[in-house]
Amino acid sequence: MQRPNILFCIADDAAWLHFGAYGCGWVSTPVFDGVAARGVLFENCYTPNAKSAPSRASLLTGRYSWQLGEAGNHICHFPEDIKVFTEALEEAGYDVAFTGKGWAPGNPGMKDGRKRQLTGEA
């Protein structure tokens, strides 16, 4: 069985109402709309934290901010004992990478003697 490709998009300062896939007629987002039409489009999502780094930490771990220790703060040291979904994907044989801003601001910590890449290689 072929594994699915996984594309996770985060757009700072954009809301659901800014994409055609959600019914917007005044902003053109044809590429996003095409990907959404062929994949999974979430319709009931809420931010767990109003700050960017804690919100991203929740997305990466599947945990609420209050469960993340120091990672629940805006500028922090990410706890080494908390695994992120990108690490689980790498362990399963996926290639993981990001473009733009991954998890930040803060210190992602170390893993296996090197700086931890919470969102994959840049």
Model-predicted regions and their roles:
Residues 1-122:
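Formylglycine-dependent sulfatase
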